Design a protein with these regions (language model features):
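Hydrophobic packing residues within well-ordered alpha-helices of enzyme cores
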Residues: 124, 151, 174-178, 247
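A short alpha/beta connector and helix-capping loop motif
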Residues: 134-136, 173-210
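Active-site glycine- and acidic-residue-rich loops that bind
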Residues: 164-174
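SAM cofactor-binding core of SAM-dependent methyltransferases
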Residues: 58-153, 157-165, 193-196
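Rossmann-like AdoMet/SAM-dependent catalytic core
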Residues: 27-82, 89, 97, 103, ...
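Acidic, low-complexity intrinsically disordered segments
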Residues: 1-24
Length: 291
């Protein structure tokens, strides 16, 4: 009775109507962004000759649990270089349902998740993975000083298959701090696509600094190219939205990827205005048995 009376008030009806309008507008904008992203990818495939090169990774992008098509590119990298222990490590896993390794977990891989925000733990609880050895986790803020210690304490193998770093501000410094302590076969790194491909640039290091929402973050693709070369890795591609770069350890590159392995050759500009979940709402996928 009181509820019906409450909702009959003109001001409440107007608020409900406005909320419904806002929800419809948000849905329309999201759908429009998703359509734009699809059209962009289709347009690039038909107009950019790089997509015709089978050694490039751009044409293999698809989105299962990732944000920018990383799932497909990662699958293609390991189709070319093979897998060994099927172990991943990712820093910056977000909410636990949309990141670079959630899809691998559903395909039978095991690994390690670390993030400063504990929200991803809720997803692990829902999926029954909190006590599982398949996915170990830690809530921690990664920096240059603690990265090696955290990976060592978690028991991450030195030669895991995949390392993914997406910690916004200090990613360049953290990858550099790993040195020879860990030698993943492939690496996914967030880069700053606002900086042109030929310019070497990175933010000043401060362990307590966090991303302020501007384009003053991380490092340019050229800076990562040079860091990767120093660590023994080759830049083999970027995702179409200019968010992540992909590196493969030099001893595994062979003739599998498009040379030269430079930022000028593989750079994609930031297209963040087109990043949107394509399709149904995201969720952790059921885990398949390892073949």
């Amino acid at each position: 009775m009181l509820a019906r009376l409450y909702h009959s008030l003109p001001v409440i009806r107007e608020l409900d109507l406005n909320n419904r309008r806002l929800a419809q507008l948000h849905e329309a904008l999201a759908t429009g962004t998703s359509v734009q992203a699809r059209h962009l990818l289709e347009w690039l495939k038909h107009t950019d000759p790089r997509y015709a090169d089978s050694k490039r990774l751009l044409g293999y992008a698809f989105q299962a649990c990732s944000q920018n098509g990383e799932d497909g590119i990662i699958q293609e990298i390991f189709r070319r270089i093979g897998v060994t222990n099927r172990v991943f490590y990712e820093s910056g896993v977000g909410n636990g349902v949309e990141n670079n390794t959630a899809f691998l977990l559903s395909l039978g891989w095991s690994g390690f998740w670390v993030d400063a925000n504990p929200r991803f733990v809720t997803q692990l609880e829902k999926a029954g993975l909190l006590k599982s050895r398949l996915l170990q986790h830690r809530v921690a803020k990664i920096n240059r000083e603690n990265i090696v210690g955290i990976l060592t304490d978690l028991g991450v193998p030195k030669e895991l298959d995949l390392l993914s770093l997406d910690i916004d501000q200090n990613t360049w410094h953290v990858w550099g701090a790993l040195g020879d302590s860990f030698r993943p076969r492939a690496v996914v790194i967030e880069y700053n696509g606002a900086v042109p491909p030929g310019i070497e640039w990175k933010v000043e290091y401060d362990a307590e600094r966090v991303w302020d929402g501007t384009h003053n973050f991380g490092a340019s693709l050229k800076a990562y190219e040079k860091l990767g070369r120093r660590l023994g890795y080759s830049l083999v591609g970027c995702d179409p939205f200019g968010a992540n770069a992909f590196f493969v350890r030099n001893d595994l590159v062979g003739e599998h990827f498009a040379a030269p392995f430079t930022s000028e050759n593989h750079f994609e500009p930031a297209r963040f205005h087109l990043i949107h979940r394509m399709g149904l709402p995201n969720q952790m996928l059921d885990r398949m048995p390892v073949p």
